[in-house]
Amino acid sequence: MIEKDDWRLVDQTRYLMHIPLKKAVYRRPSPNWDHDHCEFCWDTFSEYDGDLHEGYCTIDETYWICPECFADFKEMFHWTLAEKE
């Protein structure tokens, strides 16, 4: 069980509590925006070698969560996985 004082917790409950997520491959949203970060550990998602290429995100792909942080926080945040389209 993750402790409430885990270093990765920085007010994400405001916008990530009880929301559906989907598993997705990261695709750059625009030519000028080539990466995102895990909302918890700050690991980088991008299409570049050495970065994360897939993980979990909000349905609109605004917020990304790496697989490790998803596993660590899924119970605390009560996430559900959306059905694949």
What are these regions (language model features)?
Residues 1, 26, 57-58, 70-72:
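Intrinsically disordered, low-complexity regions enriched in Ser/Pro/Gly/Gln/His and often acidic
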Residues 1-25:
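N-terminal alpha-helical interaction blocks
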Residues 20-37, 56-60:
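Short, flexible, mixed-charge glycine/proline-rich loop motifs
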Residues 38-42, 66-69:
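Short cysteine-rich clusters marking metal-coordination/redox-active sites
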Residues 48-53, 76-78:
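Short Cys/His-rich "knuckle" micro-motifs
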Residues 61-84:
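Short metal-binding segments enriched for Cys and/or His
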